[in-house]
Amino acid sequence: MNPLTRVALAVAAFAALVLALSACGPAHVAGHVPKRRDYAVPDAAGQEAQVASAGSTWREGRAASMLYTDARALRENDLVVVRIEEIADAKRSADTDLTRRSELNASIEAFLTSLDTPYALKGGATTGFKGLGSTARTERLTATVPAVVRKVLPNGNLFIEGHRVVLVNAEEQHFYISGVVRPIDIDQENGVKSSMVADAEIEFTGRGVLSDNQRQGWLSRLLGWFWPF
């Protein structure tokens, strides 16, 4: 086998290995580690889980117990759909107008009687300041993210956490939400609004070509940090 053939076979084997490894999992723009939030109950004092007595005819988890109930998330590892719709509209304005004026008149004719020309001292000062500023910001985020019940709290509320990754044309978008919901706020379609999620953490980030182009270069950031004007 000549050396050229060996090189060709080595390149082909390497390409096959790369394709096999790339097919083993989803292709991310960069290394991705899903976020996991370690949620702790703020104050569990006085909150005790409701446990049925041993002789109760109603036992949670039995097949018969689901005959007359809906399929909403109630236990750990159950799924619930979170409909994110966050709207933030903030406006602020400030107007300041300050004026200060002082005037001083003093005559010294009584001390200089031998002179016909009167002498007087006059002085005055005026200062003023006027400032006007305003700011406005509007944000809207709409998405649907399936979440998993990570923990059932002692009072029956559910701690949920969900991720969603969307890859389109080398642009990767990450959705994340976590928080506490009440089972009563979950509708018949097993969904809940983000406005009903307490202690919520909602993140929407992107990685890829578009996100890189929207970010200022490191040299521009360095010059902006040094430039005083």
From Swiss-Prot:
Its main location: membrane. It is a lipid-anchor. GO terms for biological process: bacterial-type flagellum-dependent cell motility. Keywords: Bacterial flagellum, Cell outer membrane, Lipoprotein, Membrane, Palmitate, Signal. InterPro entries: Flag_Lring (IPR000527). GO terms for molecular function: cytoskeletal motor activity. The basal body constitutes a major portion of the flagellar organelle and consists of four rings (L,P,S, and M) mounted on a central rod. Belongs to the FlgH family. This is Flagellar L-ring protein. It comes from Anaeromyxobacter dehalogenans (strain 2CP-1 / ATCC BAA-258).
